[in-house]
A protein has these predicted regions:
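Transmembrane helical cores of multi-pass secondary ion antiporters/exchangers
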Residues: 1-376
Length: 376
């Protein structure tokens, strides 16, 4: 296992650095590292690492969501107004609809399998979008028009919305049924997640004010609570549940509202955690990709991905109706809101891990979508 960890970190970071040097996202280098090291090429990774790959990817997702919550400016969301709110769910919904329409005809999937694939692909990647938008704001591009703020505001909530839909579709695939209650549970689980997360965030802010402990210890406490929330959601068998991932993000938001200086310091700590988590996430996703399977579905998968992206871009166009943005600014926003990476890497392998017949296909298309859109 130790050899596998060293190979993942050293080669993953090295390939990421090479990609950065040629103006490509570092995650592409990490994905390639995983594919080469994985069981379908060189087979250099220990089974013990591959066996806990799903848990490690979930930890990475928890880290990026908490970091997003600690840094999300809700006042900015209110200032931008209607378009920012629409960007949280309209483009993802359009892309999901596009996938449900295209995938069954081109890839022979059922509507539910297509919905699972659509939910995996529909999220935009904070790992790609956030650094680029922050750079644009630092350089002053589009700030007066609110373009970077608009994309940043929608990106984090967009992810959580899609993950909740994904969890719902997976539950239906496992035989839990497609009852009306299942769909009613979507907004309820979102609101319960928000309420639970905010409550925990406020309580933690009060606790951290009374108890003077190191920031590293605070991070460990938040991580432990986040893990407990995920386990609780998995164990709940009631018709009405809560979204643990939304709760995790809103812990950061609640903490930020009450103790902004602490939230900023913790965001920096989570940023350092993400350095390692990102390498493990993308290398391990690459390791699960069956290269032979990629060859079989390549062209059809490309058509489905591009078709669904066209639906997504139209969704962004709908969100921007009534704004003062010029044609080029609208086109930039439509393209900037397409990159895939973090969520696809975190949940793309779940259908395969659960033994779904569409699992290999979903993972392959997810990785192909990352390779295709991340450089945009």
């Amino acid at each position: 296992m130790l050899l596998s960890i060293s190979l993942i970190l050293i080669l993953g970071m090295f390939m990421g650095w090479i990609c950065q040097k040629i103006k490509l996202p570092s995650l592409l280098g990490m994905l390639i590292t995983g594919i080469v090291l994985g069981p379908y090429v060189l087979n250099l990774l220990d089974d013990s690492i591959l066996g806990i790959s799903a848990e490690l990817r979930k930890i990475a997702l928890i880290i990026i969501l908490t970091r997003a919550g600690l840094g999300l400016d809700l006042s900015g969301l209110k200032k931008i107004g209607r378009p920012a709110v629409l960007m949280c769910f309209v483009p993802a919904s359009f892309e999901l609809i596009g996938m449900i329409l295209l995938a069954p005809k081109l890839m022979g999937l059922t509507a539910l399998e297509a919905a699972i694939m659509g939910a995996v692909l529909a999220a935009v990647s904070p790992a790609v979008v956030v650094p680029r938008m922050v750079k644009l704001m630092d350089e002053g591009y589009g700030v007066n028009e609110g373009i970077p703020q608009l994309i940043l505001a929608g990106a984090s909530v967009d992810d959580v919305y899609v993950i909740v839909l994904f969890s719902t579709f997976v539950g239906m695939m496992q035989g839990e049924g497609a009852s009306i209650l299942k769909f009613v549970n979507i907004p309820i689980s979102i609101f319960l997640g928000i309420a639970i997360g905010l409550l925990i965030g406020v309580l933690l802010a009060y606790f951290f004010k009374k108890m003077h402990i190191r920031d590293t210890s605070k991070v460990l406490i938040i991580l432990s609570i986040s893990f407990l929330l995920v386990v609780m959601e998995d164990k709940l068998s009631t018709p009405i549940t809560f979204s643990a991932l939304i709760a995790i993000m809103f812990i950061g938001i609640g903490l930020q509202k009450k103790r902004e200086t602490v939230a900023k310091r913790l965001s920096v700590k989570y940023g350092k955690l993400w350095v390692a988590a990102e390498v493990f996430l993308f290398v391990l996703v690459g390791a699960t990709v069956n290269i032979g399977y990629l060859g079989k579905v390549g062209v059809k998968a490309l058509i489905v991905i591009i078709g669904a992206l066209v639906f997504r871009m139209f969704g962004v166009f709908v969100c921007l109706l009534g704004t003062s943005l010029k044609r080029k600014e609208r086109l930039f926003t439509m393209l900037a809101y397409t990159p895939k990476a973090t969520v696809q890497a975190a949940i793309g392998g779940i259908p395969l891990a659960l033994g779904f017949t569409c699992g290999d296909l979903v993972l392959t298309v997810a990785v192909l979508a990352i390779v295709l859109t991340a450089p945009l």
